[in-house]
Design a protein with these regions (language model features):
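Conserved active-site tyrosine of GNAT-family acetyltransferases
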Residues: 19-24, 89, 113-116
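Short glycine-/small-residue motifs
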Residues: 118-121
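Vicinal oxygen chelate
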Residues: 1-8, 30-77, 86-112, 123-128
Length: 128
């Protein structure tokens, strides 16, 4: 059996510095590594606990990127206390939904990064 494992979420932001500030200053994620390529394009790998996010101005796979594609995915993070985690988030336009009980039985809230990517923080009440 093949056991694929989630490695990271890759984001090619329209404003690298704004996205870096969002993930570091708003979410409080730790920087694992930062780099600048031979053309001066920046990148950073961030640790959000169980998920890594890579932000890069010029990805190696840029030829398959579609910057005009509509929003198609939301990153869902499994957290232990939605209200406590939300209290750590500074106020701002990045808040899409405050903590609420959703139809899946989770307590969740949703943020939007500077490029419009959604990040849902889910406290699952019923664990399987």
């Amino acid at each position: 059996m093949v056991a694929d494992r989630f490695e990271n979420l890759f984001i090619c932001p329209s404003d690298f510095n704004a996205s870096r500030r969002f993930y570091v200053d708003v979410l409080g994620w730790q920087i694992i590594s930062e780099w600048t390529d031979n053309h001066g394009k920046k990148g950073v790998t961030l640790n959000g606990g169980a998920v890594r996010v890579v932000l890069a101005e010029s990805p190696e796979d840029a030829t398959i990127q579609n910057p005009n594609a509509p929003h198609a995915a939301t990153l869902h993070l499994d957290i232990h206390d939605a209200d406590k985690r939300f209290a750590q988030i500074p106020a701002g336009e990045h808040i899409v939904q405050s903590p609420h009980d959703n139809e899946r039985g989770a307590r969740s809230f949703v943020l939007r990064d500077p490029d419009g990517n959604l990040i849902a923080f889910d406290e699952m009440r019923q664990r399987s």
